[in-house]
Amino acid sequence: MALLKSRLLVGVARCQPCLAAVQGRASSWWSHVEMGPPDPILGVTEAFKRDTNSKKMNLGVGAYRDDNGKPYVLSSVRKAEAQLASKNLDKEYLPIGGLAEFARASAQLALGENCDAIQSGRFITVQTISGTGSLRVGANFLQRFYKYSRDVYLPKPSWGNHTPIFRDAGLEVKGYRYYDPKTCGFDFTGALDDISKIPEQSIILFHACAHNPTGVDPKQEQWKELAALIKSRRLFPFFDMAYQGFASGDTNRDAWAVRHFIQEGINVVLSQSYAKNMGLYGERVGAFTVVCSDAEEAKRVESQLKILIRPMYSNPPLNGARIAAAILTQPDLRKEWLQEVKGMANRIISMREQLVSNLKKEGSIHNWQHISDQIGMFCFTGLRPEQVERLIKEFSIYMTKDGRISVAGVTSANNGYLAHAIHQVTK
């Protein structure tokens, strides 16, 4: 009996550290952390995956698909990859500012090779971690060095990530009217009215082309008026250009607004992404450009951008930048890429036109002209949340509650089904 009691006491003693560990875990450092809300777009994808309907459609995710609904890798990208693989290149770190030939080629693509800022060297472009990284580098740079205002005005609505990017960088996010739900088009009058009241020297963000999420872009004459107003109000423009070439199929046309502002003597900052127009989603290829007053100022800005980037991510990824640089700088690859970009843009334009035509064939009495008037990957359909809910439940057509669809997810095979479903929930 004494031996059994002794063994029990030893066993209890051995368990004391375990009990202490359990108690320690119970009083975790992170017990106060609440569950964050799910990403609305990723939530759409998860629901789509669970659906067993053979006709289901995922119109939530902003990634291009071919007319068979499959991911599309550009031929120019494949050729650039093969070319790079044959060179047996190293995998050394890039400089903080990224691959120099990529950065310069990106600036030339956006601003135009004959742009005065390019010719005089009064710009600096750094490679970034796609468009999101570019926006964050830009936001941090403005937070630290733009001494005139802490307010950044975004179009209403804007890409969902814009607000947290600028807010988390320490800037105050505000808005100006942009989309008119009555016309499903650009609220030009409202935009001019709001912008005219923005305090001078505030920061204002524009989507250079293919506005996300509405697909609504100003016309060139409207851009001219906006530029004149920005200049007279002494506002600071931040352009986000994630879809150059992907909107109209013409890289020069899609960059028109940015180039016009610079021609008018307005120095801008610019974010670029190659996720959509080169299909380099997972490679995370982007650029951030600051147009300066002179070359000496550009050098000072470059030095501070490097200081910002170093503790953020040290240096950007190598492989995607090499691919993009090869495409942008080699005439044969560039020519093929421009044709492929135009092909992707044209497929999306065609899907828009077919959808409008199919809705008419269904007998819809509503005006769906805005679907073909809008541009780029996304379309604001004008559908109400309860109509979207019916599309999901009755037809397995998935989209965000605001009625935004990714036209890239529409194909020749399912266009008619989509039109039929939309007609059923709107008639």
UniProtKB/Swiss-Prot annotation:
Q: Where is the transit peptide?
A: 1-26
Q: Which residues carry this modification: N6-(pyridoxal phosphate)lysine?
A: K276
Q: Which reaction does it catalyse?
A: L-aspartate + 2-oxoglutarate = oxaloacetate + L-glutamate; L-kynurenine + 2-oxoglutarate = kynurenate + L-glutamate + H2O
Q: Which Gene3D superfamilies match?
A: Aspartate Aminotransferase, domain 1, Type I PLP-dependent aspartate aminotransferase-like (Major domain)
The places in or outside the cell where this protein is found are:
Mitochondrion matrix
State its cofactor.
pyridoxal 5'-phosphate
Provide the binding site for substrate.
G62, W159, N212, R404
One BP annotation, GO: 2-oxoglutarate metabolic process
Q: Which UniProt keywords apply?
A: Aminotransferase, Mitochondrion, Pyridoxal phosphate, Transferase, Transit peptide
Q: Name one Pfam family in it.
A: Aminotran_1_2
EC code: 2.6.1.1, 2.6.1.7
Q: Does the keyword Lipoprotein apply?
A: no
Any GO CC annotation of this UniProt entry:
mitochondrion
- Which leading EC class covers this enzyme? transferase
Asked if the keyword Ribonucleoprotein belongs to this entry, the reply reads no
Q: What is a single molecular function from GO for this protein?
A: L-aspartate:2-oxoglutarate aminotransferase activity
**Highest taxon, organism lineage:** Eukaryota
The main location is mitochondrion
What else does UniProt say about it? Answer: In eukaryotes there are cytoplasmic, mitochondrial and chloroplastic isozymes.
Cite the record's note on assembly.
Homodimer.
Instruction: Name the family.
Output: Belongs to the class-I pyridoxal-phosphate-dependent aminotransferase family.
- Main function: Catalyzes the irreversible transamination of the L-tryptophan metabolite L-kynurenine to form kynurenic acid (KA). As a member of the malate-aspartate shuttle, it has a key role in the intracellular NAD(H) redox balance. Is important for metabolite exchange between mitochondria and cytosol, and for amino acid metabolism.
> What name goes with this protein?
Aspartate aminotransferase, mitochondrial
Organism from which the protein derives = Xenopus tropicalis
